[in-house]
Amino acid sequence: MIGNRVINLLIVATLALAGQTVLALELGQDCVNPVGEAGKCVLFRECQPLVDIYNKPVNTPDDTQFLTESRCGLYERKTLVCCAGVRSKGKTSLPESPNCGVQLTDRVIGGQPTKIDEFPWTALIEYEKPNGRFGFHCGGSVINERYILTAAHCITSIPRGWKVHRVRLGEWDLSSTTDQEDDFYADAPIDLDIEKIIVHPGYNLQDKSHHNDIALIRFNREINYSSTISAICLPLSNSLRNRKHAGLSSYAAGWGKTETASASQKKLKVELTVVDVKDCSPAYQRNGISLDSTQMCAGGIRGKDTCSGDSGGPLMRQMSGSWYLIGVVSFGPQKCGAPGVPGVYTNVAEYVDWIKDNIY
């Protein structure tokens, strides 16, 4: 094991790569991290999320930039960093970067099955059917130890006699009881009973524009994070909420229908370009659908889209080393993956206050 002094020298060298001026804050002072989230200026070794990023087998340029820009001062020649995401007492909190949106590997290549530990916040919603059978027909995203975020239509627009039954986390291959990739064996997925479901009060089943298509599911217990189960970040700060994503690359992941119209057994991912909602509105207006700023669009390239089995699942972007949930899969063209018609997503940034008001 490398001595503390050597580790500190390595950290200082890594954090100095960008050559930027370090804020001269004192130990314990309030600070703001690179993505605009509030934190405390602490010793590097006391900020476990940053230590975890530093200790990853391979650091991406975003990782290095985030580490560099997290510096906030020096204390007795030791590096201080702005550490965000301290959990508030008495109420379930939402994690902030770098306590969320981190996966052990950065191997995103669009249009392929995921690796076993990619996007560990993806969830499956299981339904109980009248014939005594069960099935997974919607997705969601882990946002902390007690909740997933999903689409309202996954709760209210389901066939007669169906009931939302449980939530599964840590899944990768539905055809296997033990997920394995190369020499890595994942822990068994967990099935969680549901304590409460909160559908946005503004969602109207009869509204074909699907405004306010967002819901929360609360587990009956807290979960423990692992390499295959963790939370994705939400855009909590004003700077993140106001960020424009149009024209930029994003990713969706889930077990939905493929271009062959059959559900995938393994978790899939697809790279999608975000489209300004004003630019994709005309494609839907002819069908009497009116989109607004609480929605966003992505995709529109033949064969690259999210399909019905992915409803409620995540649309995400990696920013400053962490993955952020920017959209929830809502609806799309009648023919999935139709060219020129992007899919529609609930714009998560518009619902951060609602989410914060409804978790406990």
UniProtKB/Swiss-Prot annotation:
Residues 1-24 form the signal peptide. SUPFAM superfamilies: Trypsin-like serine proteases. In females, expressed in fat body, cuticle, thorax and ovaries. It holds the Pfam family Trypsin. Residues 108-360 form the Peptidase S1 domain. Its EC number is 3.4.21.-. Its main location: secreted. Coiled coil: none annotated. InterPro entries: CLIP (IPR022700), CLIP_sf (IPR038565), Peptidase_S1_PA (IPR009003), Peptidase_S1_PA_chymotrypsin (IPR043504), Peptidase_S1A (IPR001314), Ser/Thr_Proteases_Immune/Dev (IPR051487), Trypsin_dom (IPR001254), TRYPSIN_HIS (IPR018114). Induction: Induced following a blood meal. Induced in response to bacterial infection. Induced in response to P.berghei infection. Disruption phenotype: RNAi-mediated knockdown in the resistant strain L3-5 infected with P.berghei, causes a 5-fold reduction in the number of melanized ookinetes. Simultaneous RNAi-mediated knockdown of CLIPB4 and CLIPB17 in the resistant strain L3-5 infected with P.berghei, causes a 52-fold reduction in the number of melanized ookinetes. RNAi-mediated knockdown in the susceptible strain G3 infected with P.berghei has no effect on the response to parasite infection. Residues 30-83 form the Clip domain. Glycans are attached at residue 224. One of its GO terms (biological process) is proteolysis. Belongs to the peptidase S1 family. CLIP subfamily. This is CLIP domain-containing serine protease B4. It comes from Anopheles gambiae (African malaria mosquito).
